[in-house]
Amino acid sequence: MAKQIYDSMAMKRALTRMTYEIIEKNKGIDDLVLVGIKTRGVYLAQRIADRLKQLENAEVPVGQLDITLYRDDRHDASLAQDPVVNEADLGFDIKDKHVILVDDVLFTGRTIRAALDALMDIGRPKKINLAVLVDRGHRELPIRADFVGKNIPTAMDEQVAVYVDEVDGKDGIELKKL
């Protein structure tokens, strides 16, 4: 059975707070770009960009990052098929930019490690910060988020499910027992 952690309004408030934190920490939005990790990170990045536009009256580029080829588990025998790989083109140059990498859930850190590898293959940004909607702990790598919507301590037999309207038809965060 799933336990609701955030409804759509709480999720919106968390993203708004994260947006303010991004502005404050960076003293504005100069040279800022957002890169969402597919799939849900892309939609969260776009929502942050929309809020930045409302607050700062300026567009911030948003790109999407497919980390499929960079995952350290892609050769796992339990994966039934070869990965589908999309072009690694963000649509803008990240050289000397301040990149905010956006994802839905931070767990072991392996997805973020893969995303950092992918970003470095694309270009050399001036700085990279990490924004996640949920930090659930249980890190296997020394990775920490700079902007967090909600810290949710979890057990290993639990799963955090983030829903975004663009993919799932609703917004929210649930905690599920496996």
Curated annotation (Swiss-Prot):
Pfam families: Pribosyltran (PF00156)
Domain of life from the UniProt record: Bacteria
GO molecular function: RNA binding; uracil phosphoribosyltransferase activity
Keywords (A to Z) from UniProt: Glycosyltransferase, RNA-binding, Transcription, Transcription regulation, Transcription termination, Transferase
Enzyme class: transferase
Database matches in SUPFAM superfamilies: PRTase-like (SSF53271)
Record's catalysed reaction(s): UMP + diphosphate = 5-phospho-alpha-D-ribose 1-diphosphate + uracil
GO biological process: DNA-templated transcription termination
Gene3D superfamilies: 3.40.50.2020
Keyword flag Ion transport: no
Short sequence motif PRPP-binding: positions: 99-111
EC annotation from Swiss-Prot or TrEMBL: 2.4.2.9
Keyword Ribosomal protein (UniProt): no
Assembly mode: Homodimer and homohexamer; in equilibrium.
Function of the protein: Regulates transcriptional attenuation of the pyrimidine nucleotide (pyr) operon by binding in a uridine-dependent manner to specific sites on pyr mRNA. This disrupts an antiterminator hairpin in the RNA and favors formation of a downstream transcription terminator, leading to a reduced expression of downstream genes.
Similarity-based family: Belongs to the purine/pyrimidine phosphoribosyltransferase family. PyrR subfamily.
Protein name, per record: Bifunctional protein PyrR
